[in-house]
Amino acid sequence: MDSDSTVTSLEENTENFCTNPTRDILAEGITNLFKPTIERLDERVASTIQLQAELRGQLDALAAQLRDIEKAQSQIPEFADKVKELLNVKHKVTVISNVLVTSQERLTGLHKLIEKEQRRRQALLDSALSTNIS
């Protein structure tokens, strides 16, 4: 092994890490760039979770009412099958709701990226036109 190693000590790396203003500014800029999007996404996820919990509660209440009706009218044998179908529908509604929410969030993000790209291209075009006119 070479005794003249170029590897720096942990203390030197820690010093460089702590006193790098360019890195700090860049990190702060990146954080500020993503923070609003992450906050909106977090709010939407929380809202969706709450709405799904409410829907699940309503479907559970309906299923309980149907079970009570089934007990009261036990002479209708196909009614139990309808309760099972309702529970299957409840599961499907939950899955579809999750897919739709995810798709909507992705489409919203894509739409924002498209608008941003259009503004950037328009600014470049305006800049090029003003340079050519001058």
Swiss-Prot record:
Similarity section: Belongs to the SNAPIN family.
GO MF annotation: an example: SNARE binding
Species assigned in the record: Drosophila melanogaster (Fruit fly)
Segments forming a coiled coil: 50-124
The protein's name in its UniProt record: SNAPIN protein homolog
Membrane topology, as annotated: Peripheral membrane protein
Subunit comment: Component of the biogenesis of lysosome-related organelles complex-1 (BLOC-1) composed of Blos1, Blos2, Blos3, Blos4, Dysb, Muted, Pldn and Snapin. Interacts with Blos2 and Dysb.
Compartments in which it is found: Membrane; Cytoplasm, Cytosol
